[in-house]
């Protein structure tokens, strides 16, 4: 749904991604501190047109085939299927669009990898329930999944339940449609919403296995190993803690239970999850089949607050610049070896197949008069990361399903 555009065509309803603007209001809206549940003329909304894949998917997929791609990762827009998020009957026009898209992929021998929810909580459900803070979102999501699984069984084998699910804790409106009232316990609300998404993910896995024998369902993490800024024990511990926090959701989705460290952390913070009878069994029975993740850079962390200002290579808030790495024009550390390190960390922790589903370089590109972009720097970036994946496969023996 990030690239298709056509946000108000084909019977599609409004979702959270449609009201997150470009510019200074982007992060306040994404974080739930600035309420915006509709569009206005004073903002530019990137999702409205995006790259207009909705109208150009056939030529786009033909170009994929020309490049030799064997997999296309895409997201289905929840509100293109269920405009209000929980409609009893799906939008047939939306189903036909994706059906045609999948057929086009298969025509060229390209396997679709489909994300079920990619930062697009239906606005109608945010207004009705408050987004994922409400348990009823689990039923709405499960209904949505069932519609897709029944319709696309045989066309889609690989599924992801939630895109970068760990971003819920950092950008809660973007990740879960959360808005906060004055005096609300924000941390309690975010972790409760997280529990609802984890339960929904487990239900989706079970449903997919029942309706589509042979299908594989994965989780999706915004990944990137944390390095200690120095070898000081406090920095080493800070890096270990940051990695563990980042793996919270995947611990539950891959191991089927809340880890002890997370329970202790919530206890210290006064967080009390409301769980229904059977939730723990459901999490155990709905574990994912593989681990997918995005990787753009590693992170560097220190307890020395004076170093946090020197962060031009910082891709996340509260990290320090790594003096051993170059940074992109956007300030993100370029670390191909970090991809291999991250892959090994994930496999050592979970012992499940891996899938790199996002990787790339942002840059200030120059568009030539003929429309071409001579981005040798991006080619170099991708080549270096692919070389590290090759080492992870052949030298480390990691089971890598794909790279897209």
Over which residues does each language-model region extend?
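Short, flexible active-site loop motifs that bind/organize anionic cofactors or intermediates
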Residues: 47, 54, 85-88, 329
